[in-house]
């Protein structure tokens, strides 16, 4: 040992590494000694170190190794002696260190365990490097772990004062001394424990006292080493050597030892691998991973001095890897917990340890680990960073070679165990030094101190910080990521190490001898690169895939029609044709356009061209989607919308081929057969034109006016959606037709305008039809959305497209939905059934209904066109509103005609804006209802009912009759009768709605696009991106949020169940209210009916003209309801109520004659839509009427609770719907100024409207139409509508009002409950939704059945799961629209209603029962019931979209309102009924239906109340 020490001194004198304070003197010597000692160690260690290491190996990994190592070391002391002697003989501290590292690891650990004994502890302290012990343990962590951590561990764990002093001194020295000093000391101490400790004292501790202590300890430990500690001494030497010598001895003999080490590595790869866990070689083998793993290796320094020194080398070479020090710490903990990983970890640790040693000089500086680990830092700090690191590398390499060789020799006999032990010792010392020091008394403390030194010792932390600063300085902080990466990489690396490590170790050996860590880095880098190659695919891929589907324009195609079972497809002409049909390309659509142009009239041809043009994604339709590639939904909207326009433009198209053709033939035949057939035969041959022509010539005129009026509003919306296109088209169309501003706006508008003109001309003659055709042609040319105009021509291409390619505009989910054939089959069957049902009424009606149905279906299929058609729908809405204004002149027939036109127009327009156009159509129908009780109600209700029930003509008329009965005339039934005629339109519309449900299911975004365009496309575009995925969601959102489909971000959730979709407010409003929705049809019908029915009930009050004004006007209309004429105008505005999205439309509608009573209030409210919403909340007390209106709404909300009558259930629906409205209102405040205006028009605008409603309620109650007035305020929100309806009921049922108020409160609470409600809906799944739908569908259907025409409205399919699903999907959009409309008013109502509930209760109770109790209440009941019915439908629609909420939160405004409404509705429902929301909905629907029946019973207020009582009981 003295010789070794002398040699170490000589080596220090030689100072291979002069830069290293101690190592420069001792490095060469130490390395030589280490080499020789390593050789000797190999010779001796194989004998004894095997048992020692064997005993220790299990203990090291466990951290218990040191104590057993003690005894084994004590048993193997001779071998440590021999090892030490061999180092002495070899006079190489490197050899001694290596030997000590191998056999001395156990002994060193035992010595460290012995440091519990004063002798061993003094020795270890004396050798703070404990070079033999330290090297043994510290080859893995020679410098930083062994010295600093070992000393520190001794200090902490070992009560021995010497250790504590030396640990403190070491810490001080580490702070003072460079790692090189420690390395020299470690080398010297390892080589000669005495001199090594002197070096430790001098260099590590930085003062000779430590050397004296080291001498004393050497002397004391020398006997220990000779006696019991020789092995331990050798271990200390090995550790110290490993620390200092691996760092500096290796640095001293970097070339020599490294070359030898390389040779040795090549000779014994596996052993070297094992040794590598402890040796520099392990650093080479595991440097990269270990560096990564132990770059943060404050603890790693504890793992092994040799590893630490090696790591120092690599860390100084790989400063960038030091950030893994923290990972090393983490791995230390892992190793401590998982000793089995030690073998792998020591390697990583040795790599990381050395890297960390060099990087984290700090750890070696504070603890030995800080010195070795921070050696690079210190070296960098002391200008020895690289040189020392190189030296360290070389010395460590040498030392590791020596150690690796001897341990390899030792590993050969005991290398596996010893090297494993040594690895584990390193790992343990690095990671399990706590355990090692704990078992060893010093080692446990050592690792603890290592951790403490890392964490607690400011020097360690500082050095760690230094390491972080120096490059691997982020030792602790980055371990989280690094840990995963390292561990994973370590594993990979281990795998590579076993297979590639020999080669790479050789390369690394060769490279480290080069001494540049950069070489090591290069070598490490390959592994890192290798690891990099193992990167997992980014999660973004799914989004890419989804976006890809989203962007697919041809996603309109029903992919479901493709047989997925066909693994291989023979692309025969038939197949290609099939696929071309399924997925029409540009050429296909161009061909289609050409075919349409050639097969259809000139007007048809332009429309078809446009439609084909756009669906072909060739020009407008496809190119805009291409332009909007980012917003692929928007593209789809455009494409589908155009297709929808095409479809809607052609009833045949809507019918998909046969249906469309049949409908078109029927239409043409029926239209021609009709006096207006000539006109319809003209360009007006479009579905809407034929139907309209069939229906009414007065209606044509009214519709022309309505179209005119609607055109500007629609223009506004179209400008919003497609400003350039819509404006150009509008301008061109406008220039072409003064009477058809809507037509100018968009194909739907064109269609509507042209149809209106055609109808207007139909009565006058065919000249107007030709003019319409010409203008329509012009429109087709000018308007991108032209296809809507040519319904007849459109059917061909649409029929081909629909038949060949049931276009699912919804995108991928839409395709999936279509694949389920829900939307496609349902649409087709619904359209067909509905056409058949509607055909019951009359051939013309049937044709009309059938054609519109087909148009609707095709429109729905063409959701992309719907986006474009949204403009048309908006314009059409405006037209409808205009017609509503003009409508009063032509009350019934004009209304029917208009209704038919509207239905036709909607058929076309609905294709243009599935939701919006449907809503517009519905609204137009509502307008028609308002305008013409039969037609409008038939159209709106029929549309809704067709939507809901796939309805038969009888089903549509009942609602139409109901609506018409409610508001068209004092006699409610009479308008209901006209429902069947309108039902054809409605049937068509329903077909469209069904198709909308289906297509909405397949192309929710399309419907959303329609709705957005119609209402607040721009505002809710953001919420619309997922619409295509979530049909129900889309339907609710389609009016408000179709444009957001452009946002493909949310669409990336194909599942549509990600909270991503809910992050928008739509999350809250969307799901709970939507899930139970009866069906898209019911919801849509409900929206339209609620708008139209409420408005219609309120009887086309001018308030219906504009959403806000509709309410006011509806109030007037209630008064005017007896005056069917004024009521119809208001109904036109009611249609505009749906047009609430179009503030301009609303404003325009307000301009209608119906504005007479509420025009100013509506204007005010529209103007103050957002303010009015707040004012709505506050205005309930503003005026009795407002309070009453609020009360009505609140009553409707509360009625479920307060009322024990049937009214209570509808109020429950109202309350249910109110949350949606409220949420929607909330969102409307932000998103829909006009919506809010509308809501305000209904609610806030009801200071006038409500006062008017109070009056109108009173008057209408007197006149039998007050319900409409009450409904109109209710219409502010869905709940508002219901509130009015329920207000009507409270008129005859005060408890209803109270219950509504309670439900309103429940509504507000339900918002908060809706997440669970959504979850319950989700949990219940479609079962709940279906249950709700069935409850809503059947009750809606039954009451309609009760009314006889209600049956017509609710076809048997309405209860069918498919139809229910469609209702959920398709009903949501109108619900959303209505909810959006009512959302503003609904939120206002919810707030205002709460205030006005008492007032409303008193007023409604007073006014309604006081006024024509039977007739007024009857109408009110009907209105309320119908509203409730629609509200329930809406509620169900809202509930239905629970999955919509799941699907998407694009409809944040609508969705949130809807969800809130759903939640609130459920809350109210539960509050008023403590029953399952489903049952409540069912009963509420039943009560609504019973109320409707009672209403259908005209003035039978008692009956209605009885019904109410019955259903309240049910509730």
Curated annotation (Swiss-Prot):
InterPro entries: DUF4683 (IPR032757), Nexmif (IPR042794). Residues 746-757, 763-772 have a biased composition (Polar residues). Expressed in the brain, particularly during the late embryonic and perinatal stages of development. In the developing brain, it is expressed only in the cortical plate and subplate region but not in the intermediate or ventricular zone. It comes from Mus musculus. It is found in: Nucleus; Cytoplasm. Involved in neurite outgrowth by regulating cell-cell adhesion via the N-cadherin signaling pathway. May act by regulating expression of protein-coding genes, such as N-cadherins and integrin beta-1 (ITGB1). Its main location: nucleus. GO terms for biological process: negative regulation of cell adhesion mediated by integrin; negative regulation of cell-cell adhesion mediated by cadherin; negative regulation of cell-matrix adhesion; negative regulation of neuron migration; nervous system development. Residues 381-405, 1455-1479 have a biased composition (Basic and acidic residues). Residues 1180-1193 have a biased composition (Low complexity). Keywords: Cytoplasm, Developmental protein, Neurogenesis, Nucleus, Transcription, Transcription regulation. This is Neurite extension and migration factor. GO terms for cellular component: cytosol; midbody; nucleoplasm. Residues 1442-1452 have a biased composition (Basic residues). Pfam families: DUF4683 (PF15735).
């Amino acid at each position: 040992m003295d010789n070794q020490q002398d040699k170490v001194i000589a080596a220090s004198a030689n100072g291979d590494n002069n830069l290293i304070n101690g190592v420069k003197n001792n490095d060469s010597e130490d390395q030589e000694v280490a080499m020789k000692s390593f050789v000797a160690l190999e010779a001796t260690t194989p004998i004894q170190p095997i048992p020692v290491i064997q005993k220790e190996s299990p203990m090291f990994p466990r951290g218990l190794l040191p104590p057993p190592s003690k005894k084994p070391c004590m048993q193997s002391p001779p071998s440590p002696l021999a090892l030490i002697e061999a180092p002495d003989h070899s006079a190489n501290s490197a050899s001694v260190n290596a030997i000590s590292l191998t056999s001395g690891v156990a002994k060193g650990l035992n010595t460290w365990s012995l440091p519990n004994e004063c002798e061993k502890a003094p020795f270890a302290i004396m050798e703070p490097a404990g070079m033999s012990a330290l090297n043994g343990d510290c080859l893995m962590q020679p410098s930083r772990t062994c010295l600093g951590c070992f000393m520190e561990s001794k200090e902490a764990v070992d009560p021995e004062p010497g250790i504590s002093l030396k640990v403190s001194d070491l810490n001080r020295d580490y702070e003072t001394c460079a790692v090189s000093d420690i390395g020299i000391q470690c080398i010297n101490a390892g080589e000669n424990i005495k001199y090594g400790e002197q070096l430790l004292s001098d260099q590590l501790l930085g003062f000779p006292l430590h050397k004296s202590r080291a001498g004393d300890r050497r002397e004391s430990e020398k006997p220990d080493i000779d006696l019991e500690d020789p092995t331990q001494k050798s271990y200390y030497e090995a550790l110290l050597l490993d620390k200092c010598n691996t760092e500096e001895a290796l640095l001293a003999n970097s070339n020599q030892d490294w070359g030898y080490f390389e040779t040795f590595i090549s000779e014994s790869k596996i052993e070297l691998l094992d040794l590598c866990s402890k040796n520099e070689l392990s650093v080479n083998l595991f440097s990269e991973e270990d560096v990564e793993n132990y770059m943060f290796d404050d603890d790693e320094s504890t793992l092994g001095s040799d590893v630490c020194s090696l790591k120092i080398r690599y860390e100084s070479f790989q400063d960038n890897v030091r950030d893994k020090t923290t990972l090393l710490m983490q791995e230390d903990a892992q190793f401590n917990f998982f000793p089995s990983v030690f073998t792998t970890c020591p390697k990583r640790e040795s790599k990381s340890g050395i890297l960390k040693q060099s990087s984290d000089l700090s750890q070696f500086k504070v603890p030995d680990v800080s010195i070795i680990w921070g050696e690079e830092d210190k070296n960098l700090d002391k200008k020895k960073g690289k040189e020392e690191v190189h030296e360290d590398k070389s010395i460590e390499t040498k030392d590791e070679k020596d150690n690796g060789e001897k341990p390899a020799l030792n590993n050969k006999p005991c290398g596996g165990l010893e090297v494993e032990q040594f690895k584990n010792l390193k790992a343990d010392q690095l990671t399990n030094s706590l355990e090692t020091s704990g078992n060893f008394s010093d080692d446990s403390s050592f690792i603890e101190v290592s951790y403490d030194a890392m964490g607690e010792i400011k020097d360690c932390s500082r050095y760690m910080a230094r390491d972080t600063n120096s490059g691997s300085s982020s030792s602790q902080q980055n371990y989280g990521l690094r840990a995963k990466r390292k561990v994973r990489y370590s594993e990979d690396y281990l795998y590579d190490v076993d297979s590639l490590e020999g080669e790479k170790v050789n390369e690394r050996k060769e490279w480290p001898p080069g001494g540049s860590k950069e070489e090591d880095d290069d070598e490490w880098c390959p592994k890192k690169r290798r690891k990099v190659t193992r990167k997992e695919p980014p999660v973004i891929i799914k989004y890419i895939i989804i976006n890809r589907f989203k962007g697919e324009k041809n996603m309109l195609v029903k992919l479901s029609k493709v047989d997925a079972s066909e693994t291989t497809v023979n692309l025969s002409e038939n197949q290609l044709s099939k696929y071309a049909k399924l997925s029409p390309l540009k050429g296909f659509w161009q061909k289609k356009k050409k075919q349409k142009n050639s097969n259809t009239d000139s007007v048809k041809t332009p429309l078809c061209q446009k439609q084909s043009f756009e669906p072909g994604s060739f020009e407008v339709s496809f190119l805009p989607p291409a332009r909007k590639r980012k917003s692929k939904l928007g593209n789809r909207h455009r494409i589908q919308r155009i297709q929808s326009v095409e479809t809607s433009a052609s009833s045949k198209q809507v019918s998909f081929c046969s249906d469309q053709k049949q409908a078109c033939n029927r239409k043409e035949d029926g239209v021609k057969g009709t006096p207006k057939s000539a006109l319809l035969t003209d360009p007006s041959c479009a579905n809407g034109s034929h139907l309209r022509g069939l229906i009414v010539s007065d209606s044509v005129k009214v519709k022309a006016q309505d179209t005119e009026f609607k055109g500007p509003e629609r223009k506004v919306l179209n400008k919003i959606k497609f400003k350039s296109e819509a404006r150009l088209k509008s301008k061109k169309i406008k220039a072409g037709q003064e009477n058809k501003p809507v037509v100018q706006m968009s194909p739907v508008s064109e269609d509507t305008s042209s149809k209106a003109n055609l109808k207007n001309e139909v009565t006058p003659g065919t000249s107007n039809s030709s003019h319409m055709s010409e203008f329509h042609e012009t429109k087709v040319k000018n308007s991108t959305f032209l296809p809507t105009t040519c319904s007849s021509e459109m059917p061909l291409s649409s029929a081909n497209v629909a038949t060949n390619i049931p276009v699912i505009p919804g995108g991928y989910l839409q395709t999936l939905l279509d694949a389920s054939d829900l939307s496609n089959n349902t649409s087709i069957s619904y359209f067909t059934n509905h056409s058949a049902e509607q055909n019951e009424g009359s051939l013309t009606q049937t044709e009309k209904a059938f054609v519109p149905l087909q148009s609707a279906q095709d429109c729905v299929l063409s959701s992309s066109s719907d986006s474009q058609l949204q403009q048309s729908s908006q314009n059409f809405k405006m037209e409808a509103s205009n017609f509503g204004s003009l409508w009063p002149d032509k009350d019934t027939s004009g209304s029917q005609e208009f209704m038919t036109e509207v239905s036709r127009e909607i058929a076309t327009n609905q294709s243009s804006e599935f939701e919006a156009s449907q809503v517009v159509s519905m609204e137009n129908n509502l307008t028609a209802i308002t305008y013409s009780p039969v037609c409008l109600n038939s159209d709106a209700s029929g549309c809704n009912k067709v939507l809901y029930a796939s309805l038969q003509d009888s089903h549509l008329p009942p609602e139409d009759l109901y609506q018409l009965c409610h508001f068209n005339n004092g006699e409610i039934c009479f308008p209901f009768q006209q429902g069947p005629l309108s039902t054809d339109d409605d049937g068509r519309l329903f077909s469209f709605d069904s198709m909308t449900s289906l297509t909405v299911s397949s192309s929710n975004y399309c419907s959303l696009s329609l709705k957005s365009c119609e209402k607040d496309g721009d505002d809710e575009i953001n919420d619309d991106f997922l619409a295509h995925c979530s049909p129900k969601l889309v339907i609710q959102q389609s009016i408000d949020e179709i444009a957001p489909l452009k946002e493909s971000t949310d669409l990336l959730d194909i599942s549509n169940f990600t909270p991503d979709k809910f992050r928008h407010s739509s999350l809250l409003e969307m799901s709970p209210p939507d899930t139970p929705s009866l069906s898209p049809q019911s919801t849509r019908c409900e929206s339209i009916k609620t708008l139209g029915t409420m408005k219609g009930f309120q009887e086309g009050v001018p308030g219906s003209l504009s959403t806000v004004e509709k309410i006011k006007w509806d109030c007037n209309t209630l008064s005017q309801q007896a005056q069917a004429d004024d009521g119809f105008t208001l109904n036109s505005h009611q249609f505009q109520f749906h047009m609430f999205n179009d503030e301009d439309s609303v404003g325009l509608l307000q301009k209608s004659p119906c504005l007479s009573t509420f025009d100013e209030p509506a204007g005010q409210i529209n103007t103050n839509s957002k303010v009015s919403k707040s004012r709505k909340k506050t205005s309930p007390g503003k005026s009795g009427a407002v309070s009453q209106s609020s009360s009505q709404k609140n009553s409707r909300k509360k009625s479920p609770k307060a009322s024990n009558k049937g009214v209570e259930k509808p109020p429950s629906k109202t309350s249910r719907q109110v949350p949606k409205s409220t949420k929607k209102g909330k969102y409307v405040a932000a998103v829909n100024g006009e919506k809010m205006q509308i809501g305000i028009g209904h609610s806030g605008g009801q200071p006038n409207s409500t006062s008017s409603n109070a009056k109108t309620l009173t008057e209408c109650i007197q006149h039998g139409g007050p319900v409409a007035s009450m409904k109109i305020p209710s219409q502010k929100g869905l709940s508002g509508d219901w509130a009015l309806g329920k207000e009507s009921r409270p008129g005859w049922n005060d408890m209803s009002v109270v219950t509504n108020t309670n439900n309103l409160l429940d509504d507000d609470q339900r918002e908060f409950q809706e997440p669970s409600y959504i979850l319950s809906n989700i949990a219940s799944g479609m079962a709940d939704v279906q249950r709700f739908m069935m409850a809503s569908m059947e009750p809606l259907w039954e009451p309609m059945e009760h009314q006889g025409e209600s049956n017509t409205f609710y076809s048997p399919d309405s209860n069918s799961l498919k139809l229910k699903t469609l209702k959920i999907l398709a009903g949501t959009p109108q619900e959303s629209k209505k909810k959006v409309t009512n959302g503003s008013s609904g939120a206002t109502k919810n707030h205002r209603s709460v205030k006005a509930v008492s007032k409303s209760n008193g007023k409604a109770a007073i006014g309604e029962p006081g006024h024509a109790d039977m007739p007024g209440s009857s109408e009110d009941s009907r209105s309320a019931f119908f509203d409730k019915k629609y509200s329930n439908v809406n509620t169900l629609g809202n509930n239905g979209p629970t999955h919509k909420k799941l699907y998407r939160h694009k409809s944040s405004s609508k969705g949130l309102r809807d969800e809130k409404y759903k939640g609130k509705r459920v809350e109210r429902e539960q509050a008023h009924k403590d029953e399952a929301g489903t049952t409540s909905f069912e009963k509420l629907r039943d009560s609504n239906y019973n109320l409707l029946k009672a209403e259908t019973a005209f003035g039978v207020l008692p009956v209605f109340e009885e019904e109410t009582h019955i259903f309240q009981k049910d509730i």
